[in-house]
Amino acid sequence: MQSLENGRWLNEPTKAEASNTELSVTTDANTDFWRETHYGFVRDSGHFYAFQAQRDFTAQVRIQAQFKNLYDQAGLMVRLNERQWVKTGIEFSDGYGLLSSVLTNETSDWATGRYDSDPSDFWIRVTVQSGVLRIQASYDGRTWPLVRLCPFPEADHYLVGPMCCTPERAGLEVRFSEWRLGRALGKELHDLS
């Protein structure tokens, strides 16, 4: 595990506390990351606790939260700038905690799928390597099925870290722990470890 003390906030929440082992956040009202698609608006107000990563990396974190309102969300973000980023994790929609990923390259897309385990306690992993983004989720921190595989812009470095938003309210309490950031794991696509 690595320390969660030295991240840098984009849109620091009113209530947040970072220690060596965990980051606790309570979301502010009307926070979100989105660009244009369907809704026609741009929002760059979500909470993002960023660490710098080199060209090829893997990051993962455990997330605990009680998602209950529409669009409550928490997970990881990888960001180049306000127009090129991805956020992924659990997002509450249509009465369920869904596995969600939003890939943005000028405009946002949104891909979701049902999460069959407990959405209040999960792990999310992102790997960026050679222009490819791989997202995996886990219910136990040991088995990591694929959520998404897609192109992602190559860069010398990225910002990556915990992300949470509540577009419709304030007050989602999120605990991030078991943070890891390092070189890309380089595993085969169907290696779920």
Explain the meaning of each model-derived region.
Residues M1-S193:
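Extracellular glycan-recognition regions
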